A protein has these predicted regions:
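Catalytic nucleophile serine of serine hydrolases
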Residues: 1-2, 26
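Gly/Ala-rich beta-loop-alpha elbow adjacent to hydrolase catalytic centers
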Residues: 4, 8
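Flexible "cap/lid" loop of the alpha/beta hydrolase fold
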Residues: 9, 13, 20-62
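Generic structural signal for small/hydrophobic residues in well-ordered secondary structure
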Residues: 26, 77, 96, 109, ...
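Short aromatic-enriched loop/helix-cap "lid" or pocket-rim segments at secondary-structure transitions
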Residues: 33-39, 139, 146-148, 174-176
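Conserved alpha/beta-hydrolase catalytic His-Asp/Glu region
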Residues: 34, 58-130
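Conserved loop-alpha-helix segment in the C-terminal half of the alpha/beta-hydrolase fold
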Residues: 127-167
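Catalytic active-site module of serine/aspartate enzymes centered on a nucleophile-bearing elbow/loop
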Residues: 157-191
Length: 191
């Protein structure tokens, strides 16, 4: 899911023929990556140097982390990620909150928000020979379904784009039954 999709694509590239298929759920599009400058709007291109400078400063990244590493804030973010509201509970909040209390979690966060020149899914699709399924939440607030459709239209190894109605960034949590059925169908089709 999300950035894990890009990691999975890179792993599939390395594994070559040992990868039989790939399921990407709301794969990260990494809209802030430097390689996407030409596709960004003028305002984003103007703001990008400022954003990069600010988030590279520990005082800023630590402040952002300390504000985000709060169960109330995590719950607010989850409400955006899960527009149906399904499966947002104390257990999920705790699962996401607990790692923020570990040693070096601030540095991990700082590293993550400073990834401005890394792998893009679009750079990896054509290096993966296995069939790919995209599963997308219809109401994902961060990863554009329009771009997912463009990926499918432009990359032959993307065999399916399945959209889960009313789901957001984590359709596997909001609607696990439908997500699992779609994955099983893809596995059957690609045997």
């Amino acid at each position: 899911n999300s950035i894990g999709g890009v990691v999975s694509l890179k792993a599939a590239e390395i594994l070559k023929e040992n990868c039989n298929g790939l399921v990407l759920i709301d794969c990260a599009q990494r809209t802030m990556d430097d390689k996407r400058l030409k596709r960004s709007d003028v305002l984003m291109n103007l703001l990008r140097p400022l954003i990069k400078t600010l988030v590279s400063k520990r005082i800023i990244s630590n402040t952002l982390f300390e504000r985000a590493a709060n169960p109330r804030v995590i719950k607010q973010i989850l409400k955006k990620a899960y527009p149906s509201g399904k499966n947002i509970d104390e257990e999920l909040i705790e699962i996401l909150y607990n790692p923020t209390q570990r040693r070096n979690s601030k540095e991990a966060f700082r590293g993550f928000i400073n990834l401005f020149d890394d792998y893009l899914a679009t750079d990896l699709f054509d290096k993966v020979y296995a069939p790919i399924q995209l599963i997308w939440g219809e109401r994902d607030p961060w990863e554009s379904i329009t771009e997912a459709q463009s990926w499918k239209d432009n990359h032959n190894n993307i065999q399916r784009l399945d959209v889960i109605k009313e789901a957001g960034h984590c359709p596997h949590d909001e609607n696990p039954e439908e997500t699992n059925n779609l994955i099983c169908k893809f596995i059957q089709e690609t045997k």
